[in-house]
């Protein structure tokens, strides 16, 4: 059993506590049936990350839901369908929360996987990602000027439910997309990832780690080495923690 003890000295001032009550996905759910904007605002949710939106049947946010024909021109506004994603993000903005936008796709538990394979054209995929950022931050395709800061490249590529390619293929995707985003948008955005499954067992000695635990630690180490070697933009690291006993 994992236990954490927190000791508080009320006589010592350390400054403001960073907000820790961000949440995954916005107030609109079940294809618009429920809207909890009021509750989000009352709770003061500081940021909302977009992943597995309207799971298990996503219609918005995912790159392949917005840009459905990858033979089309990513520079042409008419090839994007932002309608549902616009509504979804507008509801988040109205609550006062900031958006963390995951560029990629949702998890696929079914036997047939549709969107988790490496893109056929990495440069075109990066161009589409730029189009999405441009829409929400620079008004492209009748868009907005939200100033969304954090753009996360994919989610859990260590998992075969999220990425059917190799480790090297994901690393190349990260390099391609991150460099394209920073080239166009510079310091107006931050790019990172890779929304890791976690790094379980990192507190243990090497010989005490399970094969499962070693996998995630090795992936992180290899990723850090890769972004250093390729000078890929890497401005934040995101990860998940799935609880005790892993």
Model-identified regions with their sequence ranges:
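Aromatic- and kink-enriched transmembrane "portal" helix at the membrane-lumen/periplasm boundary
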Residues: 157-160
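Non-catalytic accessory regions flanking glycosidase/transglycosidase catalytic cores in CAZymes
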Residues: 1-150, 164, 168-198, 232-233
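Aromatic- and acid-rich polysaccharide-binding/catalytic face
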Residues: 95, 101, 129, 147-155, ...
């Amino acid at each position: 059993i994992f236990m954490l003890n927190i000791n508080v000295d009320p006589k010592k001032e350390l400054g403001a506590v960073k907000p820790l009550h961000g949440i995954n996905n916005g107030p609109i759910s079940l294809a618009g049936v429920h809207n909890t904007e009021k509750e989000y605002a009352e709770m003061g949710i500081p940021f909302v990350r977009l992943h597995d939106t309207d799971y298990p049947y996503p219609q918005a946010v995912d790159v392949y839901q917005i840009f459905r024909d990858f033979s089309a021109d990513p520079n042409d506004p008419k090839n994007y369908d932002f309608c549902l994603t616009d509504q979804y993000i507008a509801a988040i903005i109205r609550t006062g929360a900031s958006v963390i936008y995951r560029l990629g796709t949702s998890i696929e538990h079914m036997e047939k996987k549709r969107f988790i394979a490496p893109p056929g054209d990495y440069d075109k995929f990066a161009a589409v990602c730029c189009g999405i950022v441009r829409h929400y931050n620079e008004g492209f395709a009748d868009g907005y000027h939200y100033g969304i800061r954090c753009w996360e490249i994919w989610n859990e590529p260590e998992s075969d439910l999220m990425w059917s390619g190799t480790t090297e293929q994901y690393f190349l995707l990260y390099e391609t997309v991150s460099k394209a985003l920073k080239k166009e948008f510079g310091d107006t955005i931050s790019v990172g990832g890779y929304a890791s499954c976690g790094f379980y067992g990192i507190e243990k000695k090497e010989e005490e780690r399970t094969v499962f635990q070693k996998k995630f630690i090795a992936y992180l180490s290899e990723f850090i080495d890769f972004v250093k070697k390729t000078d890929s933009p890497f401005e934040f690291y995101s990860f998940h923690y799935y609880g005790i006993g892993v």
